[in-house]
């Protein structure tokens, strides 16, 4: 499994450098950086998308990942979910929102589970592998911080911050 993940990451890095790829329009505007020299300034580095969670599909044919872009003026980040066909290296953007979608993983039935702040707090969502059929699975007060399903998807374990007692900040 480690070799598949390493291979997928190397493939993702190689495909990301392909200048012939059609650009996907994000829901936010990424800066159009022009390099005046070969020096990588902080502005140039911040304009790059950062790859987040990576997960290989149960059939080991598709790579699931998210890309985060930072907006300096708004002082916030945007994350969207993508899939890549490992056979041909073509990527497809599944989400395109002004919210963060992250922590994505494949479920045992071939769907994609992920966290999103779309409902006001971070909750668990699920969609089909093609991005259709978006469904909110949790509505936990204050949101969740992580999740994992049992192998048969009959049980869900989620993380949540819980305040135990008052401290000096209260």
Please give the residue ranges for each predicted region:
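Hydrophobic beta-strand positions that form the internal "hydrophobic ladder"
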Residues: 60-64, 94, 110-113, 137, ...
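Multi-bladed beta-propeller domains
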Residues: 24-50, 73-76, 84-100, 128-143
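C-terminal motif of bacterial Sec signal peptides marking the signal peptidase cleavage site
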Residues: 14-16
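A flexible loop/linker signature enriched in serine peptidases of the S9 family
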Residues: 48, 67-80, 95-102, 115-125, ...
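Sec-dependent signal peptide recognition
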Residues: 2-8
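Bacterial signal peptide processing site
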Residues: 18-20
């Amino acid at each position: 499994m480690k070799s598949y993940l390493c291979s997928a990451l190397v493939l993702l890095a190689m495909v990301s450098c392909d200048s012939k790829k059609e650009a996907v329009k994000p829901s936010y505007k990424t800066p159009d950086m022009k390099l005046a020299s070969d020096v990588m300034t902080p502005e140039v580095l911040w304009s790059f998308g950062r790859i987040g969670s990576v997960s290989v599909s149960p059939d080991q044919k598709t790579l699931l990942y998210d890309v985060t872009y930072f907006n300096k003026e708004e002082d916030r980040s945007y994350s969207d979910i993508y899939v890549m066909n490992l056979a041909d290296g073509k990527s497809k953007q599944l989400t395109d929102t002004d919210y963060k979608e992250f922590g994505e993983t494949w479920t045992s039935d071939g769907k994609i589970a992920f966290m999103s702040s779309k409902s006001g707090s971070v909750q668990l969502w699920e969609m089909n592998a093609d991005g259709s059929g978006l469904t909110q699975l949790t509505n936990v007060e204050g949101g969740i911080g992580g999740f994992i399903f049992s192998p048969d998807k009959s049980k869900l374990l989620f993380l949540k911050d819980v305040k135990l007692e008052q401290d000096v900040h209260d």
